[in-house]
A protein has these predicted regions:
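N-terminal periplasmic/intermembrane-space "pro-region" immediately following the signal or transit peptide
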Residues: 2, 18-20, 25-95
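Surface-exposed coil loops of outer-membrane beta-barrel proteins
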Residues: 148-167, 174-269, 392, 397
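Surface-exposed loop and membrane-interface regions of Gram-negative outer-membrane beta-barrel proteins
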Residues: 99-121, 133-172, 265, 429-431
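Outer membrane beta-barrel transmembrane domains
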Residues: 249-267, 272, 276-278, 296-312, ...
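Transmembrane beta-barrel strands of outer-membrane/channel proteins
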Residues: 90-98, 142-148, 179-185, 238-244, ...
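Short loop/turn motifs that connect adjacent beta-strands in outer-membrane beta-barrel proteins
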Residues: 30-32, 67, 73-90, 102, ...
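Outer-membrane beta-barrel "beta-signal"
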Residues: 437-449
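Outer-membrane beta-barrel architecture
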Residues: 78-80, 126-128, 167-169, 226-228, ...
Length: 449
């Protein structure tokens, strides 16, 4: 009844949070060079690779793309320049992960990610096009993205080849109105899971995240219209989306029903409405980075109620989240951040209906490692009482909650290559039967082109 699907979200979170540093490391390096020379020196020319950042996808509003200069071979042997001449941009990422419970709980069949040595690999490609070249207004951009995923533990990572983004983004009135329409998953637009991550996903997968339980799409894209309005400062915003829910059967069923990503509808999945109000501020010389948001989800799909086995009228959820830079030792985006999330949904139809998370991460933890990141965090996710009561009626023991504590370090080996090492202690790694605690070693080698 409780099906979980895993992707390396907790490891990807380390890499995505590094983008908060932006070009701060380049700025810091130039300041160091200037201070060592007593006489004025010419301002270094802007790196050519920075010109290609305008072609990075803008479709993923909740995730900041890694700058082109921070990737492997920024020029791609002249390919990026040739594409840019025609209004095109291209990027690719490859995530290659390993997870294993070092406490030695190997078993067949495997019931959670990492119980036996678990491997996964993915390739993500992005192609963008400047639509102003064909008459669209302002900064309109089209994004086409695709993903291949492979793994040896397929209940956690089904082997898929799918489209992930097929959408247009454009803004009006100096970015006070922004539109996103097409196929895209909700996690790329809302919530901000990439900041701080969620320690529970190490063993349970993204289905352990409450908004995904309620129907927000995490992997396969859904047809979406997203309208973002901002005040004149561009800091306060409201983001409202009409989209399709994932299958009420869960993420794995949604992948089965929509393997290509292009399906307009899937069985039993109806309209989902998402609204997020927030305040977002980038780091500057005088201000710390901050992002506070509150969101609600209303799903018109009919879910099977655990106790009655009847169909519900709807499903809904809400979340509060905040990410705040609390130190700025070098006057830029580097430093310590605190991230917290609080999620809620009804326990009549959602297997995990409440969660609370706290994370602290440090971008640029050492003066000579400005592109690294260190993170520690804890997540407590609560299983539905109504679902536990159903299992108790059959004499089956179940966990009340799962508690996961994680620590990780992301090291930039060279521009565009990151090694992320993590250790996650998980109390109750499965719902039923009650299982011994797990200590998951996670390694991920990531390549960004």
């Amino acid at each position: 009844m409780l099906k979980m699907r895993t992707k390396p979200y907790s490891m990807k979170a380390c890499l995505m949070a590094l983008t908060w540093a932006g070009c701060a490391t380049v700025h810091a390096a130039s300041n160091d060079s200037a201070s060592a020379v007593p006489a004025p020196v010419p301002v270094p020319a802007k790196p050519k690779c920075m010109n290609y950042d305008r072609y990075l996808t803008r479709a993923e509003l909740a995730v900041k793309a890694v700058p082109v200069c921070g990737r492997i071979s920024p020029e791609l042997r002249g390919l990026r320049e040739a594409l840019a001449e025609h209004g095109l941009g291209f990027t690719a990422t490859s995530y290659n992960g390993y997870t294993y419970d070092v406490l030695g709980h190997n078993s067949k069949p495997q019931v959670y990610n990492g119980q036996n040595p678990s491997y996964n690999a993915s390739l993500n490609t992005y192609l963008t096009y400047d639509l102003t070249r064909v008459g669209f207004a302002n900064d309109a951009q089209f994004t086409l993205a695709a993903q291949w995923v492979g793994a040896n533990y397929t209940p956690a990572n089904p082997r898929v080849t799918t489209m992930t983004v097929f959408a247009i983004n454009q803004s009006f009135f100096n970015h006070q109105l922004e539109l996103e329409y097409g196929y895209i998953s909700g996690v790329r637009l809302f919530y901000g899971i990439a900041l701080g991550g969620n320690a529970s996903t190490a063993a349970l997968g993204p289905s352990s995240v409450v908004p995904f339980q309620v129907g927000m799409s995490a992997t396969e894209p859904t047809p979406t219209l997203n309208v973002i309005t901002r005040d004149a400062s561009l800091r306060f915003y409201n983001s409202f989306a009409v989209t399709r829910s994932v299958s009420p059967g869960g993420i794995a069923q949604d992948v089965k029903d929509n393997p290509s990503g292009f399906h307009l509808s899937v069985p039993d999945a109806k309209a989902l409405f998402i609204d997020e109000f927030g305040y977002k501020r980038a780091a500057s010389a005088t201000e710390n980075s901050a992002w506070f948001r509150a969101g609600t989800l209303y799903n018109t799909s009919h879910y099977t109620e655990f106790k009655t086995q009847e169909k519900s009228e709807n499903n809904y959820g809400m979340y509060l989240a905040g990410t705040l830079q609390v130190s700025k030792p070098w006057g830029d985006a580097r430093g310590w951040y605190l991230d917290s999330k609080l999620d809620y949904s009804p326990d009549s139809v959602n297997a995990i209906n409440k969660a609370i998370q706290f994370t602290a991460f440090n971008v640029g933890p050492f003066v000579n490692r400005p592109a690294d990141m260190f993170a520690v965090g804890v997540t407590k996710s609560y299983y539905s009482k109504e679902l536990r009561d159903v299992y108790a009626g059959y004499g089956m023991d179940t966990a009340n909650y799962t508690l996961a504590a994680t620590t990780s370090y992301a090291a930039r080996l060279t521009p565009g290559i990151y090694l992320i090492s993590g250790l996650t202690y998980t109390h109750n790694p499965v719902f039923t039967p009650v299982h011994s605690d797990a200590l998951l070693l996670q390694e991920s080698l990531n390549f960004l082109f």
